Amino acid sequence: MLQLASIKKSFSGKEVIKEVDISVNKGEVVVIIGPSGSGKSTLLRMINALEYPSGGDILLEGNSILFKESKGKKHPYSEKELSRFRTEIGMVFQGFHLFAHKTVLENIIEGPIHVRKMKKEAAIEEAKVLLEKVGLLDKQDAYPHSLSGGQQQRIAIARALAMKPKMLLFDEPTSALDPELVGEVLVVMKNLALEGMTMVVVTHEMGFAREVGDRIVFIDQGVIVQDAPPQHFFHSSNKNERIHKFLNTLTRNAV
């Protein structure tokens, strides 16, 4: 469904992503983990066309989301054309990114009305279904400032789902939350996985990675160190010292 082919990214001459190849199948949950500064979030932003790679290509269902071909040459898509791909690849950020001056319901119907060109009544009905799905139908008239971080993130997930994406990207969706609020967001994400939503998740929540991930991709210094199913990645037989060090650090920090 999604293929990253020899993706590279440089900032100010420094290469932060080094020829990364990843494929994601329909219905798969791929969890990307690694130390801070390893390139995880940059990778997600490139999948959503918020950052342009310095090299390589990204294919969604066999079609490039970066370039179009004309007369045998590749040309970048316009910003308007890129916006169409972004409706197919939803993204949930760690900072929620809700419109502060709009109610919960207004936040969710904004995209469907203005991008999907839905009628307002139909968008509202869909939004209510999604709010019930994330357990927040009773908050439809509330404003973001009155909600907890966990509630705001669940609204952000509902807003992303309202665009009917083919897959969802999560960029450390629980890292900005108080520990007691993390669980409510992870429950929503687990339910999406059970429903077959294709997801790429950057997270430090190892319990989620172990339980829900179909594959764990460990990135360090812009390079994929390992791409393996969780039963191998977390097993004591995994001999990769860099991964052991990373997991041990997480364990110590959690104490």
Language-model features, listed with the residues they occupy:
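Conserved ABC ATPase signature
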Residues: 143-147, 151
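Catalytic Walker B motif of ABC-type/P-loop ATPase nucleotide-binding domains
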Residues: 168-171
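C-terminal boundary and immediately downstream tail of ABC-type ATPase nucleotide-binding domains
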Residues: 231-255
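A short, surface-exposed alpha-helical micro-motif characterized by mixed small hydrophobic
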Residues: 209-211
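Conserved ABC transporter NBD signature motif
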Residues: 56-70
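A short, proline-enriched helix->beta-strand linker immediately N-terminal to the Walker B motif
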Residues: 162-166
